[in-house]
């Protein structure tokens, strides 16, 4: 068995070689994240898509498109989702409005640069005046990207992709209206200006982030969630879980710097703030009451409705505050998938569902960050059901970690990274894949060295 020193030694050997890859050529970025002496920001912004929530609101989709004056509408989904009765309601509503939808049904669960390029090519081959995304986060993110690149037909794929993998070009072209209809209670993508994908050339998870990508409307219809299989409900629910915990424990917005020279340059992920905290607390309270029921009682409309609402609320929260280490560590986990094929997911290709990749490291992450903001860790644990009345602040990280672990055990989540096919020898590559995620890892309340990251992955090989 390898010890941590051996892992770090190998990781440093790999990182120190000559490498022109933009994702892997900045091995000291994270350890230097607090060295900036620039002026800190003193303001935060709150923005979100318009949200309409309620059972059956999908029936109103046709009217919404009519109100936009839309004539040519691209509907982005996948073949399996389009067969669901609740989704057919939305398609029928579009047709009743006198609009013939043009379907793109080749969405890949956990999109890649290749699957996104297919969607881009499809969108560019038409002249749509509106987009509709129906499905989980994969469908909504694919639709956002198709909308962006069909608006800027000369753009190369990496132009808008986040640095260091892409060029993070500012979005200045006007996008078409996009309406999102989420069918899972997880990503909150209907509220955010973020699209995430696997960049296969580097085996790395990355994304595109711009307020311009936000849907103009999210139709949050909990009837869609009744079709979620048990494992899908669990994995998606843990994405909500970590969105709320990470945004609530992110650095305060006043600790983020530098202050933007122009307010339009203020990043979407700004750090925890009083308004995002409201959404995070609401989501955690809802999770405490309804998460287990929503997974194990698929016909429980109340529980699944509440988790769908929690997904949206957490999305509003993290869409403005940000996420940090659980998500930063999750990207190489998903990008370096081996042969894991989860229950409840259609398609034969190996994937690690996003929510699963995120929660795998959550116990080790919150144990690591607990000392940096103990009061918030204890408050979160208390909301989630832990008895914190006589707890000491020094134990905050361990208490929240144990609380997360209990939820994972109750909902039968796989026992750590080893259950997904990873071992000690993979840790250098996992660390290396985390380094490009500084955009979000720098929002963690505690800075991380490469050795810290290796330790977090090592501790996450088993959870129970």
UniProtKB/Swiss-Prot annotation:
Chief location of this protein within or outside the cell: mitochondrion
Location of this chain's protein in the cell: Mitochondrion
Enzyme Commission number(s) from the entry: 1.1.99.24
InterPro entries per record: ADH_Fe/GldA (IPR001670), ADH_Fe_C (IPR056798), Alcohol_dehydrogenase_Fe (IPR039697), HOT (IPR042157)
Gene3D superfamilies, per the entry: 3.40.50.1970, Dehydroquinate synthase-like - alpha domain
A biological-process GO annotation: glutamate catabolic process via 2-hydroxyglutarate
Coiled-coil annotated spans: none
Key word Mitochondrion present: yes
Top enzyme class: oxidoreductase
Keyword Transit peptide in annotation: yes
GO cellular component, one term: mitochondrion
Alphabetical keyword list: Mitochondrion, Oxidoreductase, Transit peptide
Pfam families for the chain: ADH_Fe_C (PF25137), Fe-ADH (PF00465)
Family (UniProt): Belongs to the iron-containing alcohol dehydrogenase family. Hydroxyacid-oxoacid transhydrogenase subfamily.
Annotated function: Catalyzes the cofactor-independent reversible oxidation of gamma-hydroxybutyrate (GHB) to succinic semialdehyde (SSA) coupled to reduction of 2-ketoglutarate (2-KG) to D-2-hydroxyglutarate (D-2-HG). L-3-hydroxybutyrate (L-3-OHB) is also a substrate for HOT when using 2-KG as hydrogen acceptor, resulting in the formation of D-2-HG.
Protein name, UniProt field: Probable hydroxyacid-oxoacid transhydrogenase, mitochondrial
Naturally occurring in which organism (per UniProt): Anopheles gambiae (African malaria mosquito)
């Amino acid at each position: 068995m390898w010890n941590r020193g051996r892992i770090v030694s190998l990781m440093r050997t790999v990182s120190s070689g000559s490498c022109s890859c933009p994702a892997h050529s900045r091995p000291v970025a994270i350890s230097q994240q607090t060295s900036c002496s620039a002026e800190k920001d003193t303001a935060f912004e709150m923005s979100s898509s318009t949200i309409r929530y309620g059972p059956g609101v999908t029936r109103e989709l046709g009217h919404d498109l009519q109100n936009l004056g839309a004539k040519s509408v691209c509907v982005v989904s996948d073949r399996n989702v389009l067969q669901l009765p609740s989704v057919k309601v939305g398609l029928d509503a579009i047709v009743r409005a006198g609009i013939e939808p043009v379907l793109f049904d080749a969405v890949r669960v956990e999109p890649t640069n290749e699957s996104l390029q297919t969607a881009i090519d499809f969108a560019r081959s038409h002249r749509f005046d509106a987009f509709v995304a129906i499905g989980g986060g994969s469908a909504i993110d694919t639709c956002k990207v198709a909308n962006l690149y069909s608006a800027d037909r000369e753009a190369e794929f990496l132009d808008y992709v986040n640095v260091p993998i892409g060029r993070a070009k500012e979005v200045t072209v006007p996008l078409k209206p996009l309406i999102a209809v989420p069918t899972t209670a997880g990503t909150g993508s209907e509220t955010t200006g973020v699209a995430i994908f696997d960049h296969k050339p580097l085996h790395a998870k990355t994304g595109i982030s711009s307020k311009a990508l936000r849907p103009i409307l999210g139709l949050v219809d909990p009837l869609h969630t009744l079709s979620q299989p048990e494992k899908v409900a669990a994995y998606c629910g843990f994405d909500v879980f970590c969105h709320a915990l990470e945004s609530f424990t992110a650095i305060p917005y006043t600790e983020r710097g530098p202050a933007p020279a122009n307010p339009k340059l203020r990043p979407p992920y700004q750090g925890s703030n009083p308004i995002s905290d409201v959404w995070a607390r609401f989501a955690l309270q809802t999770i405490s009451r309804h998460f287990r029921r929503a997974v194990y009682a698929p016909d429980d409309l109340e529980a699944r409705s509440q988790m769908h609402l929690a997904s949206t609320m957490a999305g509003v929260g993290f869409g403005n505050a940000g996420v940090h280490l659980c998500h930063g560590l999750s990207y190489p986990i998903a990008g370096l998938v081996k042969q894991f094929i989860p229950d409840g997911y259609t398609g034969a290709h190996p994937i690690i569902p996003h929510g699963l990749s995120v929660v795998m490291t959550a116990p080790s992450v919150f144990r690591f960050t607990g000392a940096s903001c103990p009061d918030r860790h204890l408050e979160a644990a208390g909301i989630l059901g832990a008895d914190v009345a006589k707890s000491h602040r020094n134990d905050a990280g361990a208490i929240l970690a144990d609380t997360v672990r209990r939820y994972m055990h109750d909902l039968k989540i796989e026992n750590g990274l080893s259950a997904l096919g990873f071992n000690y020898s993979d840790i250098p590559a996992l660390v290396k894949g985390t380094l490009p995620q500084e955009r979000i890892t720098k929002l963690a309340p505690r800075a991380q060295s490469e050795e810290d990251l290796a330790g977090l992955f090592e501790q996450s090989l088993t959870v129970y």
